[in-house]
Amino acid sequence: MSFLVSKPERIRRWVSEKFIVEGLRDLELFGEQPPGDTRRKTNDASSESIASFSKQEVMSSFLPEGGCYELLTVIGKGFEDLMTVNLARYKPTGEYVTVRRINLEACSNEMVTFLQGELHVSKLFNHPNIVPYRATFIADNELWVVTSFMAYGSAKDLICTHFMDGMNELAIAYILQGVLKALDYIHHMGYVHRSVKASHILISVDGKVYLSGLRSNLSMISHGQRQRVVHDFPKYSVKVLPWLSPEVLQQNLQGYDAKSDIYSVGITACELANGHVPFKDMPATQMLLEKLNGTVPCLLDTSTIPAEELTMSPSRSVANSGLSDSLTTSTPRPSNGDSPSHPYHRTFSPHFHHFVEQCLQRNPDARPSASTLLNHSFFKQIKRRASEALPELLRPVTPITNFEGSQSQDHSGIFGLVTNLEELEVDDWEF
């Protein structure tokens, strides 16, 4: 009799046994504050949101059976080409979803363990601004993860295809508010996200903001006690290096904590406002030195770019640097409007500049917490819910598909979406 268990069977047992038996218990365990924990509690608004948002309100779960899903077209690859992302239709309701299929036979044991951690976190977390997994199951030798299709794609998709010089400030405020609410919850649960960036911010057809990238989350709780710092370097993190804080990149004995995510929020704010991530295309060693030496990215506008540079063509400006003290040569980039003026001839509010400066403090202790940032003056301009305001602010962008929740069995036009879907960097979504 063989005691060897295949990787698909091992993860199948883990999914069925651990999630069913320990799911609710884990929600209670990690939701409690560890003894002696003196960290700041979440603000009242966030706490109310967490308390009132029941598991049933996240989204109805789908049946964990491959036959319930009609795979329509491949819209992306990822996880070192072991993952295929499909647009699919959930047959019982006709709703269009995203199905992420991972070939477990080709995964190393380390990858399987990595995936187990992601699935555990997906069951543990329950928040309106965190992407919910509608179903997770094994089909043949593949792990299937089902999520709702995000019709606006990611924030990175938006800046790559429509807002090449950056988004408007109010839209960014709505997006970052959703991200900070998710981070406030994640930190309250004792985790560090470690992968906040525009491609991990998804926007649904109705303008709701979701934070994804759960695969990189790390628990700061060990043996029931919250650790002051952690030292683990994120696996498979090559694509996220520009967003990582100096203390994470430094990998020394001082370690890092949840404040490292706040630095990533600051970098993401610059990414959304400038149309590209700071430290873009910079070698990893140089990037580390820049961050350790205190080089701080900024919002590119009339207050940070010298007036003489604003009269130059974009090809001779700081357009692609994201750093206020460097002059780079780059190819011209299209602007949002028809005006021939410099794309960064604009002015962001002092509140937005201060918000970014606070997030990018070199000393982690000087950075505000997520709950504190939610009360920052930058967000005072928000007057409506994101679901009401964001679709208007994203115009002329329209959702890629309006099939979400449809009961129709008619697929006419669905394959006409393929061209648009291929423009999305779905392999970066990481749900």
UniProtKB/Swiss-Prot annotation:
Xref: InterPro entries = Kinase-like_dom_sf, Prot_kinase_dom, STRAD_A/B-like
Compositionally skewed regions (Polar residues) per UniProt? 312-339
The consequence of T419A is: Loss of STK11/LKB1-mediated phosphorylation
Q: Does the keyword Nucleus apply?
A: yes
Q: Which Gene3D superfamilies match?
A: Phosphorylase Kinase, domain 1, Transferase(Phosphotransferase) domain 1
State the Gene Ontology terms under molecular function: ATP binding; kinase binding; protein kinase activator activity; protein serine/threonine kinase activator activity
| Disease linked to the protein | A homozygous 7-kb deletion involving STRADA is a cause of a syndrome characterized by polyhydramnios, megalencephaly and symptomatic epilepsy.
Q: Which family does it belong to?
A: Belongs to the protein kinase superfamily. STE Ser/Thr protein kinase family. STE20 subfamily.
Described function = Pseudokinase which, in complex with CAB39/MO25 (CAB39/MO25alpha or CAB39L/MO25beta), binds to and activates STK11/LKB1. Adopts a closed conformation typical of active protein kinases and binds STK11/LKB1 as a pseudosubstrate, promoting conformational change of STK11/LKB1 in an active conformation.
Q: What is this protein called?
A: STE20-related kinase adapter protein alpha
> Origin organism of this chain?
Homo sapiens (Human)
